[in-house]
Amino acid sequence: MNTLAPRLTDLAHGGGCGCKLAPSVLQQLLANQPAARPFAQLLVGNDMADDAAVWQVDDNTCVIATTDFFMPIVDDPRDFGRIAATNAISDVYAMGGKPILALAIVGMPINKLDSTTIAKILEGGASICAEAGIPVAGGHSIDSVEPIYGLAVIGLCHPSEVRRNGGVKAGDALILTKGIGVGIYSAAIKKNALPPGCYEEMIGSTTLLNRIGADLAADPDVHALTDVTGFGVLGHGLEMARASQLSLTLRLSAIPFLSQAYMLAEQGFITGASGRNWASYGADVVLPDDLPDWQRLLLADPQTSGGLLVACAPEKAGALVEKVRLAGYPLAGIVGTAAAGAAQIKVIS
């Protein structure tokens, strides 16, 4: 192994959840696969576009299983590991569960990265697992062309507290717990154009565990959960709408954004994944006539380790937002509503 230490982002053709296959491509691939639902205990399988698989063990216990991995979104190896681990664990929280262990997924170009750099990536991931109170109990590694890191995560949940993305009810309020703009920031990082202070803001958001999801799922007034990741707030909101057979309305002025996301998006720091996302689902999104393209693409911006999108009883929304903010998610707010109608998203000013 040599001692070269190039920028991690220079070794990857894409980074973070922006590496995900476009929604339309993924749908086409899954359409040719048999649905994994002939098992009575499999409460959530691969036919639901949900965040994780859920298997009911008995009357009191469900096992939640998920995996998530990607290429670098930042150049600091420890931060890359931390972000990837936070993102992977999030799927368990988004289903209403609590993680119990993780397995590392590691692919590294060993002729390009030295052992110290790779070790820092693993240390970063392990530090987040420790924060979540779980061990990295094993894993698998390969020599790969691009750096890849992530986790397979197992969690537990009571059957009554499983929260799917398809449980939204007409009249529900929609809450978002983190700011949008991680993809925009990552595009600026690639071009060495991220303003001062924004890197710390981005790391603070992407390494903040979504552990509030398990607390929210214990509340019967919370009807559905999902995390906002590579398909953007529009894409994951649309998954909610389709799974619930309802129409969602998002108010643009209420959506929280990272502090410089608007400025950077207007300057053209847009990822290719934003365009692919929009091409996949734009036909089911109704936008204001005067919305500029950069704002449209910002709503399709791929989030890495994004926040939770929560559907809850409208009369409880204010109290839930306050609870979420006090738990350490200061940008949380009510961003929209659900109503009877065709499965689509309408964006209003």
From Swiss-Prot:
Active site (catalytic residues): 17
GO cellular component, one term: cytoplasm
Main enzyme class: transferase
SUPFAM superfamilies xrefs: PurM C-terminal domain-like, PurM N-terminal domain-like
Pfam families: AIRS, AIRS_C
Biological process, per Gene Ontology: selenocysteine biosynthetic process
Its EC number(s): 2.7.9.3
CC cofactor note: Binds 1 Mg(2+) ion per monomer.
Site positions for Important for catalytic activity: 20
Catalysis: reaction(s): hydrogenselenide + ATP + H2O = selenophosphate + AMP + phosphate + 2 H(+)
Recorded superkingdom: Bacteria
Gene3D superfamilies: PurM-like C-terminal domain, PurM-like, N-terminal domain
Cofactor requirement: Mg(2+)
NCBIfam families, sorted: PRK00943.1, selD
Entries under PANTHER family matching the protein: INACTIVE SELENIDE, WATER DIKINASE-LIKE PROTEIN-RELATED, SELENIDE, WATER DIKINASE
Oligomer status and interactors: Homodimer.
Family statement drawn from the similarity comment of this UniProt entry: Belongs to the selenophosphate synthase 1 family. Class I subfamily.
Protein name: Selenide, water dikinase
Designated gene of the protein: selD
